[in-house]
C-alpha cells in the first residue's frame, strides 16, 4: 500500500479533495477524541471552587478559547490538506520538524499506555480480578484499541458514530439523576463552593485540558470538505465536546464528590452502563491517540507505512503499561503538554504571515533543513509559557506567533504570494 492510497490516509502528502469528508463525519471523529476521561478531573476542581453560574462562565470562556485555537489550525488544515507534523516542515524545516514529531509522538504513546492501563485496572478493581488477569487485559486492550486506528480515518469514523451517541445518552442519564439528587437546578445554584480558584488559574485549567489534542486535531480537520466544515467541526469537538466533559466532571464533584463519570455511574447504580462508558470513552480516545502517534512517526521516519507504525506504537504503549511506567509517565506527559501549544502558534504565524495563507505543494517546496526563526520562536513561546502566571498555554501560543512574525519580518523572509494548490 502506497502512502497515497486512500486507505493509508496520505501520511506524507496533502489530502486530495475527492477524499474529503462532510461536517457530520469530521465532527463525530473529533467528539470521539475529546470525550476523554482525564478532562473530567479538571471539571472536578472547578465544581468545588465556584458557584454554579461562575463555573459555567469559566467553562464557556475556557472552552471557547480552546475551540477557536483548534478552529484556526483546522482552517489551515483544510486549506493545505496537511496535518500539524507536515506543516512543521514549513515552519521548522525538513530536519527541524523532527523535534515536533518527537514531542507529539512521545506524548501520544505515553497517553496510550495510560489509557490502556486505566481501562484494565478499573475493570480489574470492579470485578476483583487478580494481577495476572489485569495484565492480560492490558495486552488485550492495547491491541484492541488500535484496531480502528489501523483501519484509518474510516475506522475512527465508524467507532465514533457508535460511541458518541451512546456516551451522550449515558451522560444525559447521569446528569439527570445527579440533578434530581441535588434538588434540581435550584439546588445546584444554591451549592456553596468548598474551595477556591482565581479566574486565571481556572481558565488555564480548562484551556490546558486538551490544548495538546487541539494542536493535533489537524490530523482529521485536513479531511474537511470546506473551511466551514473544518471550523465548525473544531468548535463542536473542542468547545462543545470538551466543554461537556469539564461540565460532567464538575457535576460529579458537586453532587457525589467524584469527578469521574464512570465512578458516578457506579454510585448511581448503573454498573453495566459504567463499564460501557469506560470502554467507549477510552477506546474512542485511544484510537485517535495512537493514530496521532502514527502520523508523527511517519513524518519522523519519512515512511508511508502508517499501519505498520500504528501497530508498532500500540506494542510500545502496551509494554509501557505492562511495565507500570504509565504512572511515572503522567507528570512528564503533562509537562510535555505545556510545550506543545507553542508549536501551534508558530504554525499559524508561518501560514498566515510568511506564506500569506497559501502553502506551496509539499512535494514541490524547497525547504531548508532548519528554519531557525521557527525554532527560535518555538523556544521563546515555551519559555514564556513556563514563566507565565496567566493561562500559560495561551501565552505560549501568542509569544511564539508574535516572535515568529517579528523575526521573519526583520529578516525579510516572507514568501511571494503562492499560487493556489489543486488538491
Q: Where in the sequence are the language-model features?
A:
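Hydrophobic transmembrane alpha-helices that form the core helical bundles
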Residues: 97-131, 283-299
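Membrane-water interface regions at transmembrane-helix termini and the short interhelical loops
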Residues: 45, 49, 74-75, 118-128, ...
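Hydrophobic alpha-helical segments and their helix-loop junctions in multi-pass secondary transporters
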Residues: 149, 165-192, 202, 207-210, ...
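C-terminal membrane-solvent junction of multi-pass transporters and transport-like membrane proteins
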Residues: 20, 344-423
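Transmembrane alpha-helical segments of multi-pass small-molecule transport proteins
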Residues: 29-33, 101-105, 116, 127-151, ...
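Extracellular loop-to-transmembrane helix junctions
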Residues: 45-75, 96-98, 238-239
Amino acid at each position: 500500500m502506497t502512502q497515497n492510497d486512500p486507505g493509508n490516509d496520505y501520511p506524507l502528502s496533502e489530502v486530495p479533495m475527492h477524499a474529503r469528508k462532510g461536517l457530520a463525519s469530521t465532527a463525530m471523529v473529533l467528539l470521539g477524541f475529546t470525550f476523554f476521561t482525564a478532562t473530567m478531573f479538571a471539571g472536578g476542581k472547578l465544581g468545588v471552587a465556584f458557584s454554579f453560574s461562575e463555573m459555567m462562565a469559566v467553562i464557556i470562556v475556557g472552552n471557547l478559547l480552546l475551540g477557536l485555537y483548534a478552529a484556526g489550525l483546522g482552517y489551515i488544515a483544510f486549506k493545505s490538506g496537511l496535518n500539524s507534523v507536515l506543516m512543521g516542515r514549513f515552519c521548522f524545516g525538513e530536519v527541524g520538524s523532527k523535534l515536533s514529531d518527537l514531542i507529539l509522538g512521545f506524548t501520544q504513546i505515553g497517553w496510550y499506555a495510560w489509557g490502556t492501563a486505566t481501562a484494565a485496572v478499573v475493570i480489574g478493581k470492579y470485578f476483583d480480578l487478580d494481577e495476572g488477569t489485569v495484565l492480560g487485559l492490558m495486552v488485550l486492550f492495547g491491541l484492541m484499541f488500535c484496531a480502528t486506528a489501523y483501519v484509518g480515518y474510516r475506522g475512527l469514523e465508524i467507532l465514533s458514530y457508535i460511541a458518541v451517541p451512546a456516551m451522550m445518552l449515558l451522560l444525559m442519564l447521569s446528569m439527570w439523576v445527579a440533578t434530581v439528587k441535588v434538588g434540581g437546578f435550584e439546588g445546584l445554584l444554591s451549592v456553596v463552593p468548598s474551595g477556591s480558584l482565581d479566574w486565571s488559574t481556572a481558565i488555564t485549567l480548562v484551556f490546558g485540558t486538551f490544548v495538546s489534542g487541539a494542536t493535533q486535531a489537524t490530523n482529521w480537520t485536513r479531511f474537511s470538505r470546506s473551511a466551514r466544515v473544518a471550523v465548525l467541526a473544531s468548535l463542536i469537538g473542542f468547545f462543545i465536546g470538551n466543554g461537556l466533559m469539564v461540565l460532567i466532571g464538575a457535576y460529579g464533584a458537586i453532587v457525589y464528590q467524584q469527578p469521574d463519570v464512570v465512578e458516578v455511574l457506579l454510585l448511581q447504580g448503573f454498573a453495566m452502563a459504567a463499564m460501557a462508558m469506560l470502554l467507549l470513552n477510552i477506546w474512542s480516545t485511544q484510537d485517535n491517540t495512537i493514530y496521532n502517534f502514527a502520523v508523527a512517526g511517519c513524518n519522523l521516519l519519512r515512511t508511508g507505512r502508517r499501519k505498520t507504525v500504528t501497530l508498532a506504537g500500540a506494542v510500545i504503549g502496551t509494554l509501557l503499561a505492562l511495565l507500570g511506567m504509565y504512572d511515572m509517565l503522567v507528570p512528564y506527559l503533562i509537562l510535555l503538554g505545556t510545550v506543545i501549544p507553542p508549536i501551534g502558534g508558530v504554525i499559524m504565524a508561518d501560514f498566515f504571515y510568511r506564506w500569506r495563507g497559501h502553502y506551496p505543494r509539499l512535494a514541490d517546496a524547497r525547504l531548508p533543513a532548519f528554519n531557525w526563526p521557527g525554532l527560535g520562536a518555538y523556544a521563546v513561546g515555551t519559555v514564556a509559557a513556563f514563566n507565565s502566571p496567566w493561562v500559560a498555554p495561551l501565552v505560549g501560543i501568542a509569544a511564539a506567533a508574535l516572535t515568529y512574525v517579528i523575526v521573519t519580518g526583520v529578516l525579510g523572509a516572507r514568501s511571494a504570494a503562492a499560487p493556489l494548490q489543486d488538491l
